[in-house]
Amino acid sequence: MFKALKINPGKARFDILFILFFLADLSCSSRLRINETPQVSQTRDLSIRMAAEWEPALGTLLVWPLSVPYKLVIELARDNHVYTLVENETAKNEAHKWYTAWGIHPEKISFIYTPQGLDSWWVRDWGPGAVYTPDGTMKLADGKYIFSTPITGIGCLDSLEFIYKSKENTIIKTETDDNATVPLGKGLELPVLDLPFINTGGNVATDGLGTAFSTCILLNENQYYGISENQFFELNKELTGIRNYNIISNFEKRGIQHIDCYLKLLDEERILVMEPPHDHELYTIYESILQKELMGLKTPYGRPYEILRIKTGRYHQDQLAAYTNSLILNKTIYVPLFKIKEDEQALKRWQEVMPGYIVKGFEFDLADEPVVSKQMKEHYRIYGWQDGDALHCRTRAIWDPEMLFISTKRIESPVNTKHKNIVYCTIIDYNKKGLVFEKCIINWRVASGKEWNTIRLKPEATSNLFSAEIPFHQSGTSVEYYISAVSKSGKSETQPRTAPQGTYSYSVH
């Protein structure tokens, strides 16, 4: 089943940072940290950074044989481009046959030959992120993926248990998947940046401004691999530009503890967190992490995060529907559905928190799929989504190496009538052709007005930084605004990306 909904407009290594870890409460296994973030008055010039999920992308990475619903493939190809990993010519021909039968145009698909190991389905976990280097080059950031995805208890110091073991009880390594990024880079004609540490994608959420979130199992995985906590943070700072690394407690009593099944970064200052039923055994754990950890964190702009909630429900016994395990790709959000009453509510919630985006939901009943591999049937049996393994786990963006990047420090509402309503933003043209400065503007209007006013952004002293003041101070009104920019390459971009359907806003008191 596939559901699409159009969202209505609505409101939508350390130098300055050190993180202290210690074991606090074994009942919920909190590993607390002090996160010191300076008060930032404007956005920063970013010389090296790891991309966020919501940034401009060329398309989506999948693997054949498929591990996602065929209707999802159709929609991904319709919306952008599908990059399909195949092991050989036989697999490519089979995939091409089915894609053609589903009406997917050949120009919307690319095939790339890569080796496939035990974990090939989970391109999110072993697959590469995108790092933009000081010279503006995008590289595929290839973390280590040697021991697959271990599980652990809820305590941050609990031991790791490895899923794949031989009859002799030795760990079966997943080096085949670990080695797949190099041929992927060759197929995409993109350079590969080797990250000498574990960087399991489903447990790494980044904001594009040097902040990342993971659960504490990631530190344990790296320690098992021989990378200390200090080395992990130092290497991230040096190679990915992540200076502010927020490690939160594990949230499952036993599991892989991947953060994308607990929360979702919506942008630089908003976090969507799952909310279980109040009578669920994990409810108090989820709430404790939110109250004691997330609410104490600061955004890159030195402000508390806006914490939003998405209600979930049981789909099988006590297993929770993983609605945060969704994919944000350009202007569309792809959501896993679990055939429960909470599905419709989850889609509506995604609409509310992401104005202007198209939200599409996908069920994954294997009986409804035209082609299902033997391995998929053995692994999932009846239904293809699980509480710790859904849509986000099996997809990954291929970001645009020549993107027009915009990030902004939005005006914090409400403001008084004497407040200088200055908007600061970072604009980087990775195409390197240069910006059309007269078309880098702020668009603003009184809320629900018909006409947009425009103000040209002024360059700051630091490269890539811009600002402008919205000259409106009438008490009792609300103002909507968005940023737009144009590159000499012909690319244009807005922030929010769905503007003018989605905008920023503030009220004047």
Model region roles, listed by residue range:
Residues M1-G10:
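N-terminal secretory signal peptides that target proteins for export/translocation
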Residues L5, F14-L17, I406:
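A detector of low-complexity, intrinsically disordered, Ser/Thr/Gly/Pro/Ala-rich segments
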Residues R13, R31-R33:
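Basic polycationic patches enriched in arginine
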Residues D15-D25:
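Bacterial N-terminal signal peptides
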Residues I34-F405:
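The feature marks the mature, well-folded catalytic cores of soluble enzymes
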Residues A397-H509:
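Glycan-association/targeting regions that enable binding to alpha-glucans and other polysaccharides
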